[in-house]
Amino acid sequence: MDRNPELAIADARPSQDGRAAPSRLDDAQLAELASRIKAWGRELGFGAIGISDTDLSEAEAGLAAWLEAGCHGEMDYMAKHGMKRARPAELVAGTRRVISARLAYLPAGTLDGAPDAQGARRDWRAREAARIADPQAAVVSVYARGRDYHKVLRNRLQTLAERIEAEIGAFGHRVFTDSAPVLEVELAQKAGVGWRGKHTLLLQRDAGSFFFLGEIYVDVPLPADAQTSPDAAPETPGAHCGSCTRCLGACPTGAIVAPYRVDARRCISYLTIELHGSIPEPLRPLIGNRVYGCDDCQLVCPWNKFAQAAPVADFDVRHGLDRASLVELFEWTAEQFDERMQGSAIRRIGYERWLRNLAVGLGNALRAAPGGIGPDARAAIVAALRARLDDPCVSALVREHVEWALRAA
């Protein structure tokens, strides 16, 4: 906890400036506080703030089965904490409520778009699809093209926590931003922030799914919001995904093995970010030119026609990551990678895995259908790969993937 989790519960004394201690707030005061928290959240740019209790018992069986099947791959931290992920009060002692927040991350310019030769503006999702279809393009997931979201989200959530403290005095709390074993989608759904889509991401009617989630675990018994009706099956009354299965069909590697179930071991986001070693050879051709993460399941989702622009400039594209080529990024030195990825979520995978991912993309470019790339582009790719292979400092991991890529030369 950022502060003693027992303090606000055990201490019934008013604060020195006359504010009531959190444990002394009556129902009306708690309701007013919840309303203010949501207003403060809007001021901080959050698209939605919701409050839930800590009962996630309905998620425990599914979590246990998913872990038992090994679908978490090398993400051992998911199994390490066991059922604490589904038991907020065990993860952070004293927790009574969870505040869930949603922050849009699409760069503002993305939704505006650039006019084509005829002056028409293409839907931004069509532009993203066009880059994925270009064998020479390096595709970085939209969320990772700007500043590291962990920092942006954490700072805003901490500011929100400080506003609460200024209102009621010291209270037990802890901020989470995809940095601990938290079932954030279940918590957000329970708090009425959205519903779990078949791709397992949270969806919201007026915002789609291109947003981050963050939480504040608190020891204050705020009134809980009504849960968003889950889409458990197409025939469920009020279902929000209905019979749509576009995300399942769009997944390049078939990682969405069933509605609401992802096998991370096949997911491109896992393979390019979480996996430390060699990417399984049968999956490499399916990755295409996606070098950090994957947005395919979101791009085809009908709800994302309502995706919102980020309220902050932190997520604006840096270093041309929305238009860079595979060769361009592959030729970065280790020093250039460290310098340019400073403050980016990409930096955490390190230079070695960055090159590994790019080598796979270059190999897939060489394997593109006839006419996919011209002879000059092909020659440039081969030259870049061979230059890396000639580097005596190249790691065994990178060398393996470069050699695989060159087998298509």
Curated annotation (Swiss-Prot):
Its main location: cytoplasm. The active site is at residue 178. Residues 232-261 form the 4Fe-4S ferredoxin-type domain. It holds the Pfam family Fer4_16. One of its GO terms (molecular function) is metal ion binding. InterPro entries: 4Fe4S_Fe-S-bd, 4Fe4S_Fe_S_CS, QueG, QueG_DUF1730. The keyword Nucleus does not apply. HAMAP family: QueG. Catalyzes the conversion of epoxyqueuosine (oQ) to queuosine (Q), which is a hypermodified base found in the wobble positions of tRNA(Asp), tRNA(Asn), tRNA(His) and tRNA(Tyr). This is Epoxyqueuosine reductase. The lineage of its organism: Bacteria, Pseudomonadati, Pseudomonadota, Betaproteobacteria, Burkholderiales.
